[in-house]
Structures are given as C-alpha cells and as structure tokens.
C-alpha cells in the first residue's frame, strides 16, 4: 500500500501525431484539445476528479493510492495517520515510538519539554519518555558496567550506538528487536512477560493461560478462584439467585455449581422442611381442593426403608402404577351401598367428590336407560390406596364402586363395613412398578322400565375387565359409537347399556375412561373394540406408545432461561422424543442400556443432558 503526493496536474497540448489516438484513463474516450497528464497517463479535465468526493483535482494537490486519485482532505480522513500528542494528521516526516506516531516537534522529553535530538538515547520508565540529560543517573559503584549494559540490546545483544532505544523489562532494546519469544511478532503495543521474556497475548495464553470454567475462554485481568476452578468475575453466578460474587465474598462449590452462603442455607432449609407424613407403605395425597394438574397428585411415598420424594416421582408418567404395592399391610373392603327407587342424588364427602371428578374407568354407551341395583368391589391380593376422607373416624376409608343412572339419580345409604385386617408379611419386596392388579366388575340384574320394546325378563350379565400394566393395545380413536360395539347382524342385537352415574370407584384411583363392548356368553366381544387398560403404564416400554421425534435442541430445559417445549411432549420423558441416533450421541449408550440403569442413575444422566 503506497500513497504518493502529487503536484498539480500539468496542462499539456496534444503533441502526438494524429495517427496515434490518445485515450482518457478514466472514461476511455479519445482525448482532443487540452488534456491533463499525470505521470504517463492522460485525462480529460472533467474526468480528473477525486475518487471519494468527486471534486476537481486539476487545481489542487492529491494523493495516489492503489492507482486511485484522492484529494488531500479525503485521504487524511480515510487513510491518514494522527499524531498521538496533538491528534492532528501527520504530513511528511513522522516519528514512531512504542507503537505510537508523533510529529517530530510533538515528540518531546517529559521533563524538559524539548524535542529529542537526532541520534540521542530515549529512556522510557514505563510512563514517560525522557532524554539522556533528564534521565536518572546511574550508580557510581559500577557505572561503567551499567553504562555498558544499558547500551546492549536485550534482544540481539549488540550495542545500541545511535538511534532510539526501547526500555522494557529493565532492559534496552532496538525497536526492531523487541519481539514475541514464540512467534517473532514485533511488539509495538501490549505484551505479557514471563520469566523476563516478552510474549504476545495469543502465545502467552496458549502456553501459560488460564481458562474460565464458565465460558471456556482465557482470563485476562481479574480472576475469581474457587478451589481449583477459575472464573471471570462476570461468569461466576450463583445457581439459585443468578447474581455475581463480590470480591472476597465466600462461596460454596458443589460439582460445577456455585452458591452464595445464604442461598445454600435457604436450599438446605427447604429440604429439611419436607417431612413425610406417611405410614410404612402408604402414599399421601393432596387435599381434594388441589388442582388436578399436579404430577400424579403425590408428594411423598414411603416403601419400606426407601422414601421416594417428588423429584423421583416426577420422573414417572402421571398414571404410573406406583400404587400397585404387592406386599400390603392392609386389605380394605368396600362398603355396602343400597339404592332407593326415587330420591335425590346422594351428596358425598369432599374426598369422594374429588375422586369422582378425576379420570375414572366407566362405560360411554349412550343407550343406557336402566338402573343398577348393586355394584361392589372385589379385593385381590393387592391393597388399594388409603385416602384422607374428612369426617371419618380413623382418617382412612376405602374406595367403593358406586353406580348411578344418568336419567334418574337415585339416593343411596352409605353403610360402613369392617375397614381393615392384617395380612402376614411375605418378606419379599417386589418391584412396585410392575404387576398391576386385576379388577373384576360385577353388574347385577338390570331392568329396563322405560322402553317397552325391550324384553321385560331380567337377565344376569357379568362383565370381566382385566387390566394389565404391560398391555400393548391402547385406544387411539375417539369414543366408539354404539354400532361399532354391537353384535353381528345374525343374532339378536341387545342394546348397549351404560352403567348409570358418572363415578366408578375402582381400586386404582386414577384411570382413564374406556368404552366396554356389549357382553355375550363367553365374555367380552373384542371384535370391534380395541380396549386400553385403565391405569396402564404408558411408558412401560418403547413399543407401547409412539413418541414424536424432536431435535435435541428443542427439548433442552435450563434453570436460567424459560424454555417453551412443544405441546405434545411428555415432560417427564423428554429423552423418549430423541431419535435413536441422537439418543446415542447425547447419552453415550443405546436405549436398551439406558432402560437397564437404576432410576437415580437415569435421572442423573438426564440432569447432565438438561432433559430433566
């Protein structure tokens, strides 16, 4: 890059023979009459203008830069060098010292304010430049040795005779010898020293630099140390409050997380305040006034010596079979219910209303017109959950199966039955996430009193519903109509009767509504209905539910930024929405290997992958 200041362009008449055409260097047309000549090039007077502003250059000075002609004002504005002392553009002779440029008259001694004589030694004490007369005298004891040492270059070792010298690291250097020890780059600005040797910033960081454990960048300037970790002051943030740490403030370090002392104490206090109120093998449910959106509506579960808190239970689906305890201490009997023919609807307690309003297994056929005389629950080898019921004697009661008609709500009398009896402990602690119970539902004699077209003879019908936690079939379609659940056209078609009432108290407290087909002699008619078991585990295996695949970036959850996840994802099973290839990349193992890990290990891996 070169810029040459040119005098005014010369007006020259066209002296070449007419046979040889002279072209304008700007427009390329033939030059006729009076032209301008700059070096060996010719221009029309109207074509010789500034490249930047377009002003006429025929009457003033200009600069040539990379073949372009620029006026003085634009050249200084675009490419000019300013004096470090007076901040004006430098034209002509320039003095460079310590990476800065000066006018010769502006580069003066800091003490006597006189310009430095040509060839005089310049002493730089780290702040100011002083001439040889104003520099501090050397010690008298070894003046000859010191004087000789000051005249030797710290880089090449040669004597500094005439010209300027650079003082750095207690040595004198030729201006061209003060270079980086590693890459040999000329150090005319900032540098970093190590063991008396100068380095540029990049090479110093590559050899001796300290990386920030927060942003993984090199630390220049202030550094915050926490144990063996180092941080920029702006990168050390408390994981609880997100605030920075002040200088000298105490901090707690836990893994890769750092805490303020007050924030850590507050977190411990919150952990201690969570006390379990359960028996040896029971689950505490929230009051009936709680919202139904809380995960499984469970706060704590105690199974033997193991206590499962909300974080462990949050990793399970909302209807996970956590209630299927294979080794119960108690087995509860359902109370007896008697219905009257005509009366107002029975008002239940607050706990019953909450259970009834939740998702329950019931029939959805719209053709029911009769009433049911009795419905009861048959206990199996597994005990149902104990619920808090206001007004009961012991604070516990048993779930019951109450059946009502939609058209005629009967009134019922609630009679308490013996509550509990003990079962010997088998000593075997089974897996609580498997072996859901088998329910048996008996429908007694049904009478149709409103439709004269139906048969008046009473028939005894029994419907068996087997619920299996590992069932592979699920109902994915909308509510089935009565035609899809009816019998074939060759037989007597019996109208589907809906179990009257909106509440069905089964031993599984939270379950999904399903449609049951019409009964026949040998049991359920499964030709036209694809039954989904109530309370079945939707995440028992990868094959029972199809998870929509999303990229890993859209599933990440952090505590600093509120991330909006897709609507159809399972928030407790975010890793199920990864493709097998991306799952292998994120967790370093296959899906089958991940499922064989313990629950706490899976949760720990999900936390590290920001999927928890």
From Swiss-Prot:
<feature type="binding site">
    <location>
        <position position="212"/>
    </location>
    <ligand>
        <name>Zn(2+) 3</name>
    </ligand>
</feature>
<feature type="region of interest" description="Disordered">
    <location>
        <begin position="471"/>
        <end position="498"/>
    </location>
</feature>
<dbReference type="Pfam" id="PF16182">
    <property type="entry name" value="AbLIM_anchor"/>
</dbReference>
<feature type="modified residue" description="Phosphoserine">
    <location>
        <position position="294"/>
    </location>
</feature>
<feature type="binding site">
    <location>
        <position position="263"/>
    </location>
    <ligand>
        <name>Zn(2+) 4</name>
    </ligand>
</feature>
<dbReference type="GO" id="GO:0030016">
    <property type="term" value="C:myofibril"/>
</dbReference>
<feature type="modified residue" description="Phosphoserine">
    <location>
        <position position="365"/>
    </location>
</feature>
<feature type="domain" description="LIM zinc-binding 4">
    <location>
        <begin position="210"/>
        <end position="270"/>
    </location>
</feature>
<feature type="binding site">
    <location>
        <position position="134"/>
    </location>
    <ligand>
        <name>Zn(2+) 2</name>
    </ligand>
</feature>
<dbReference type="Pfam" id="PF02209">
    <property type="entry name" value="VHP"/>
</dbReference>
<feature type="binding site">
    <location>
        <position position="109"/>
    </location>
    <ligand>
        <name>Zn(2+) 2</name>
    </ligand>
</feature>
<feature type="binding site">
    <location>
        <position position="86"/>
    </location>
    <ligand>
        <name>Zn(2+) 1</name>
    </ligand>
</feature>
<feature type="modified residue" description="Phosphoserine">
    <location>
        <position position="453"/>
    </location>
</feature>
<dbReference type="GO" id="GO:0007010">
    <property type="term" value="P:cytoskeleton organization"/>
</dbReference>
<dbReference type="InterPro" id="IPR051618">
    <property type="entry name" value="Actin-binding_LIM"/>
</dbReference>
<keyword id="KW-0440">LIM domain</keyword>
<feature type="compositionally biased region" description="Polar residues">
    <location>
        <begin position="394"/>
        <end position="416"/>
    </location>
</feature>
<dbReference type="InterPro" id="IPR001781">
    <property type="entry name" value="Znf_LIM"/>
</dbReference>
<feature type="modified residue" description="Phosphothreonine">
    <location>
        <position position="473"/>
    </location>
</feature>
<feature type="region of interest" description="Disordered">
    <location>
        <begin position="341"/>
        <end position="433"/>
    </location>
</feature>
<feature type="binding site">
    <location>
        <position position="241"/>
    </location>
    <ligand>
        <name>Zn(2+) 4</name>
    </ligand>
</feature>
<keyword id="KW-0479">Metal-binding</keyword>
<comment type="subunit">
    <text>Interacts with F-actin and ABRA.</text>
</comment>
<feature type="binding site">
    <location>
        <position position="260"/>
    </location>
    <ligand>
        <name>Zn(2+) 4</name>
    </ligand>
</feature>
<feature type="domain" description="HP">
    <location>
        <begin position="544"/>
        <end position="612"/>
    </location>
</feature>
<keyword id="KW-0963">Cytoplasm</keyword>
<dbReference type="GO" id="GO:0046872">
    <property type="term" value="F:metal ion binding"/>
</dbReference>
<dbReference type="GO" id="GO:0006366">
    <property type="term" value="P:transcription by RNA polymerase II"/>
</dbReference>
<keyword id="KW-0677">Repeat</keyword>
<dbReference type="InterPro" id="IPR003128">
    <property type="entry name" value="Villin_headpiece"/>
</dbReference>
<feature type="binding site">
    <location>
        <position position="106"/>
    </location>
    <ligand>
        <name>Zn(2+) 1</name>
    </ligand>
</feature>
<dbReference type="GO" id="GO:0003779">
    <property type="term" value="F:actin binding"/>
</dbReference>
<feature type="binding site">
    <location>
        <position position="235"/>
    </location>
    <ligand>
        <name>Zn(2+) 3</name>
    </ligand>
</feature>
<feature type="compositionally biased region" description="Low complexity">
    <location>
        <begin position="364"/>
        <end position="373"/>
    </location>
</feature>
<dbReference type="GO" id="GO:0015629">
    <property type="term" value="C:actin cytoskeleton"/>
</dbReference>
<dbReference type="InterPro" id="IPR036886">
    <property type="entry name" value="Villin_headpiece_dom_sf"/>
</dbReference>
<feature type="compositionally biased region" description="Basic and acidic residues">
    <location>
        <begin position="269"/>
        <end position="278"/>
    </location>
</feature>
<feature type="binding site">
    <location>
        <position position="112"/>
    </location>
    <ligand>
        <name>Zn(2+) 2</name>
    </ligand>
</feature>
<feature type="modified residue" description="Phosphoserine">
    <location>
        <position position="282"/>
    </location>
</feature>
<feature type="domain" description="LIM zinc-binding 2">
    <location>
        <begin position="81"/>
        <end position="141"/>
    </location>
</feature>
<feature type="modified residue" description="Phosphoserine">
    <location>
        <position position="368"/>
    </location>
</feature>
<keyword id="KW-0597">Phosphoprotein</keyword>
């Amino acid at each position: 890059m070169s810029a040459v200041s040119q005098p005014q362009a010369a007006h020259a008449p066209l002296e070449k023979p007419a046979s040889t055409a002279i072209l304008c260097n700007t427009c390329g047309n033939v030059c006729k009459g009076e032209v301008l000549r700059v070096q060996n090039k010719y221009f029309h007077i109207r074509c010789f203008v500034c490249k930047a502003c377009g002003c006429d250059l025929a009457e003033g000075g200009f600069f040539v830069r990379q073949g372009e002609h620029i006026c003085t004002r634009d050249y200084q504005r675009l490419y000019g060098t300013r004096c470090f002392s007076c901040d004006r553009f430098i034209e002509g002779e320039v003095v460079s010292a310590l990476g800065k440029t000066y006018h010769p008259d502006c580069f003066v001694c800091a003490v006597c304010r006189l310009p430095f004589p040509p060839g005089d030694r310049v002493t730089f004490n780290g702040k100011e430049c002083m001439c040889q007369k104003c520099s501090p005298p050397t010690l008298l004891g070894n003046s000859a040795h010191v004087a000789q040492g000051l005249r030797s270059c710290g880089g090449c070792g040669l004597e500094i005779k005439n010209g300027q010298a650079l003082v750095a690291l207690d040595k004198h250097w030729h201006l061209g010898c003060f270079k980086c020890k590693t890459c040999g780059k000329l150090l005319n600005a900032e540098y970093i020293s190590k063991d008396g040797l100068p380095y540029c910033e990049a090479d110093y960081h590559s050899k001796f630099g300290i990386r920030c454990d927060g942003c993984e960048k090199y630390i220049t300037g202030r550094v915050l140390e926490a144990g063996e970790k180092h941080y920029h002051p702006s990168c050390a943030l408390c994981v609880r409050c997100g605030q920075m740490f002040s200088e000298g403030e105490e901090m707690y370090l836990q893994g890769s997380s750092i805490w303020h002392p007050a924030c850590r104490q507050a977190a411990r206090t919150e952990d201690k305040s969570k006390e379990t109120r359960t028996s040896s093998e029971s689950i505490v449910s929230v009051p009936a006034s709680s919202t139904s959106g809380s995960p499984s509506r469970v706060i704590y579960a105690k199974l033997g010596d193991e206590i499962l808190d909300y974080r462990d239970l949050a990793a399970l689906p909302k209807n996970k079979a956590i209630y299927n305890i294979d080794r119960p201490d108690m087995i509860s009997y359902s109370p007896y219910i008697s219905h009257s023919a005509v009366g107002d609807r029975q008002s239940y307690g607050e706990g019953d209303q909450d259970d009834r309003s939740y998702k329950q297994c019931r029939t959805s056929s719209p053709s029911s017109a009769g009433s049911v005389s009795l419905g009861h629950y048959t206990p199996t080898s597994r005990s149902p959950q104990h619920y808090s019921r206001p007004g009961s004697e012991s604070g516990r009661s048993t779930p019951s199966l109450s059946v009502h008609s939609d058209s005629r709500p009967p009134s019922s009398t609630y009679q308490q039955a013996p509550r509990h009896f003990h079962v010997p402990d088998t000593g075997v602690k089974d897996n609580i996430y498997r072996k859901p119970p088998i329910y048996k539902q008996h429908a007694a004699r049904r009478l149709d009193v409103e439709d004269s077209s139906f048969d008046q003879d009473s028939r005894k019908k029994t419907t068996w519903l087997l619920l299996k936690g590992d069932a592979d079939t699920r109902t994915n379609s909308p509510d089935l109509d009565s035609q899809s659940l009816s019998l074939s056209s060759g037989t007597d078609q019996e109208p589907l009767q809906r179990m009257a009432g909106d509440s069905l108290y089964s031993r599984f407290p939270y379950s999904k509504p399903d449609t049951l087909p019409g009964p026949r002699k040998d049991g359920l008619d499964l030709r036209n209905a694809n039954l989904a078991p109530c309370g079945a585990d939707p995440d028992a295996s990868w094959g029972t539910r199809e998870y929509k695949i999303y990229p890993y970036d859209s599933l990440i959850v952090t505590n600093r930024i509120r991330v909006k996840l897709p609507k159809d994802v399972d928030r407790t099973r975010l890793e199920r929405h990864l493709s097998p290839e991306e799952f292998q990349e994120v967790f370093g193992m296959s899906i089958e290997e991940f499922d064989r890990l313990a629950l706490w290990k899976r949760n720990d891996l999900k936390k590290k992958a920001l999927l928890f």
